[in-house]
Amino acid sequence: MDPGSRWRNLPSGPSLKHLTDPSYGIPREQQKAALQELTRAHVESFNYAVHEGLGLAVQAIPPFEFAFKDERISFTILDAVISPPTVPKGTICKEANVYPAECRGRRSTYRGKLTADINWAVNGISKGIIKQFLGYVPIMVKSKLCNLRNLPPQALIEHHEEAEEMGGYFIINGIEKVIRMLIMPRRNFPIAMIRPKWKTRGPGYTQYGVSMHCVREEHSAVNMNLHYLENGTVMLNFIYRKELFFLPLGFALKALVSFSDYQIFQELIKGKEDDSFLRNSVSQMLRIVMEEGCSTQKQVLNYLGECFRVKLNVPDWYPNEQAAEFLFNQCICIHLKSNTEKFYMLCLMTRKLFALAKGECMEDNPDSLVNQEVLTPGQLFLMFLKEKLEGWLVSIKIAFDKKAQKTSVSMNTDNLMRIFTMGIDLTKPFEYLFATGNLRSKTGLGLLQDSGLCVVADKLNFIRYLSHFRCVHRGADFAKMRTTTVRRLLPESWGFLCPVHTPDGEPCGLMNHLTAVCEVVTQFVYTASIPALLCNLGVTPIDGAPHRSYSECYPVLLDGVMVGWVDKDLAPGIADSLRHFKVLREKRIPPWMEVVLIPMTGKPSLYPGLFLFTTPCRLVRPVQNLALGKEELIGTMEQIFMNVAIFEDEVFAGVTTHQELFPHSLLSVIANFIPFSDHNQSPRNMYQCQMGKQTMGFPLLTYQDRSDNKLYRLQTPQSPLVRPSMYDYYDMDNYPIGTNAIVAVISYTGYDMEDAMIVNKASWERGFAHGSVYKSEFIDLSEKIKQGDSSLVFGIKPGDPRVLQKLDDDGLPFIGAKLQYGDPYYSYLNLNTGESFVMYYKSKENCVVDNIKVCSNDTGSGKFKCVCITMRVPRNPTIGDKFASRHGQKGILSRLWPAEDMPFTESGMVPDILFNPHGFPSRMTIGMLIESMAGKSAALHGLCHDATPFIFSEENSALEYFGEMLKAAGYNFYGTERLYSGISGLELEADIFIGVVYYQRLRHMVSDKFQVRTTGARDRVTNQPIGGRNVQGGIRFGEMERDALLAHGTSFLLHDRLFNCSDRSVAHVCVKCGSLLSPLLEKPPPSWSAMRNRKYNCTLCSRSDTIDTVSVPYVFRYFVAELAAMNIKVKLDVV
């Protein structure tokens, strides 16, 4: 990862020259590196998970042992391999490799085969290795296992993909899914916290604690806490299989090492040797252990093993000491490999906890990005895979027991191979996780949530698609909290999280996006050589004694491992040396290492120490190191101890150490597309970040190869004349999202109030903002027949008058055919009976058949049973459709105004859009005014202006720059012109501000939302009109609407709408007893009777002359019946 190479070649300014280049549209030899970087964190984390990580995960799975017929059986997974996606054996095909486009088209999953080598042993003696198929697992597109890996753009196009296909997602049942990056606590770092709810965990507990999120190299995670008790002792708590356990700290320390009590005592009081309270507290913790009769390490291990083995499910022949070792390996500081390292880490956490409880140390903010990292897709994939491999071993034991109960089972390879096939299939758990985003786990995987882990990477437009891979979510549980602390924008997130790219609704502050320059570390590095380097620089090893007292030294931690101590006077020099090695790539120091020196201040502040981090999943970003003149990757924690300048005039010698690569590095990719965003009010930039993702544009170029449920397309897109340099850096002209429009700021009609806008009808007729919606429908005849029956195929019956000239001979509509409501849609035949069936087009919206794809099954042996019909629905702008500029100025099309009635300039120019001037004062979108002037000058001079934020200032005014350009072209300096009324032809008195603004058409269209009906379906229970636009239901009429009609004095209209036209019914009621349920119709008279008239009788009063009819809502009758079922009587007073 070269920290600065990406940003050394930023375009100096935008240009339109590539649009007129003869090679425009011809695929490049290589893909655009900038776009590929956006998904690199997703792809590389998955690459690590399926190669190095998978091997480490298999090694970390302990052998599964159980007893069978007085013998000890053990199964060990030696190796696991995931294969690239291929077709099954025996498939009829030309090529064995499966490509993503095929899975999208057939609505199947892009997956690879998982096989494992299982070693089985009897009484510790290996008997053989069995290679077993465990199921299919999803494969990330463009990863090392994907068949598209390293293909050039031309080859990608040949495989029906985008030339700039970025990957980073999974295809589950034909739908593109992205694993959402979640905020997690910083791994292997003790975080001091104060939580009042911890007092409820038991008697004597306080609100003070130190928490650590322990993560191994294969990403297995466990959360562990130290609690401070009122009596000065410490309690260790951890989670095993979603169950919370507590253990006095003294037992854990004694069990980890064979040190004497005095040595443990000395380690815990380091730096506070004269603190009598700490000495007494430590003595009390060790005394608790002695009171249980545990004076040696072996006795403590035996005691803990006896207490915990019932929850650990270890084999019966394990001694208690081994059970306790299993507990420490799986639950206590699992990121550390030796018990000695765990001992020193627990001692450090204890010292920090006492400092917190005594007010000598501040609490760490868990909501600050300093103490956070992100959950990458590869991390979740590997953790889930490891747990399912362990579950597969357990399922083999269950299958073994079931088999043994029915028949006698002998231990041999053939029997085991048959039993292995009875184990759980890993295909369904993975598909469920990716399809629903819900996690089914026995351990919880150390995560804070079990839902919302995956989202659909919908391609509404290309900007929305990009944002899925840069999104970072705080977590689903935090959305339910009433506190706002988790949503706050803290200064520590500068340069890592975009301050404006967050939703303005419920998820505000929870769903954030990485800045354009921010990167996620995805690589593991081995740090075995770093401790020796630290010792050479002056660090005292952990088992040595420093020259000064411990209170004058900093602890040194490397990735959560206590390395040693360093003199506080030497620490700054060591940190500078490490930073020098890091920037110059010397001494095998990785460039993404984080060097954090938290100094002693003499006041309650962060716990001091020298902390070094090389672990993955951290956020880093490049800045310019002024001393060395090179780019350096800095992390979230080390940034707060640096002095980073933004502009050259902010650099002070001896104080400033770093400088930003460019001023707009604090913005996300999407926010960088907003022109002159530094001139807008911040909420407007937030709105544009959201509306930019709702724009009709060009989400992709392979419309013919896609089978998405819905795709949008703008028919007449244009390249913006005014745009930031980042727009060209990401080649966004390949996926345009709007149109350059002539906008006049004038209140010309009464139809432009409340953000409404007038559009020139002639511009609309010429194609302004015309668009289409592509809708695809899968038709599978196998769903229409019984299982095992294969007699239905597409086709028509010759001479069938129902489909004459409407359907082709294959029973499908013609390509390009126009479909209206009631037209034949498709036809199929029953080969056994010869019967034909015709299905009709049911949508009220006219469409054109764009393309039809015939789909088969996985083995290529499917008959003509499944097709995908893609229809193109024209969606030209209509009154009520939503538009927006790139500055959060949204509005709806209120009127298509005839061109002859529109105002016009002296040169005869008629604006495309009339914008109400009242939209500017309160919104303060000065950037839109500047864009209007810049767009006007760009059109006049044939230029493309740079709208990158922060390039203008008070000294270098944008108004002066663009005003002079307009003046040079012969126009007014301030961008105004004299307009003439299109109605009277007279010159308007006021100067009208007119220019070119890039406008976006949003996906919110009246055609998708309008709902009206006269008669239709009714609910079977309440007899009221059903709701829902898709079923032609009625509109919702709520209490506020009712109050509005009452306030207008239209009560009769209210009675007609909500009663007569809803669920009016005539019911019989007994006037005497007031019952609505007791009147019943008499039994039918016998056939020989001369009386044929049947009357209503009250079953309570036994009278028929007291029955009357009333008009009541049908739902009221249902309500009375429900109350009667609860033994509640309703009595009516009939007047």
Swiss-Prot record:
Q: Which GO terms describe its cellular component?
A: chromosome; cytosol; fibrillar center; mitochondrion; nucleoplasm; RNA polymerase I complex
Give the EC number(s) listed in the UniProt record: 2.7.7.6
The UniProt annotation places Mg(2+) binding at 755
Q: Which UniProt keywords apply?
A: Chromosome, Disease variant, DNA-directed RNA polymerase, Magnesium, Metal-binding, Nucleotidyltransferase, Nucleus, Phosphoprotein, Transcription, Transferase, Zinc, Zinc-finger
What cofactor requirement does the entry state? Mg(2+)
Give the record's disease field.
Answer: Treacher Collins syndrome 4: A form of Treacher Collins syndrome, a disorder of craniofacial development. Treacher Collins syndrome is characterized by a combination of bilateral downward slanting of the palpebral fissures, colobomas of the lower eyelids with a paucity of eyelashes medial to the defect, hypoplasia of the facial bones, cleft palate, malformation of the external ears, atresia of the external auditory canals, and bilateral conductive hearing loss. TCS4 inheritance pattern is autosomal dominant.
The name this protein carries in UniProt is DNA-directed RNA polymerase I subunit RPA2
For this protein's source organism, the top of the classification is:
Eukaryota, Metazoa, Chordata, Craniata, Vertebrata
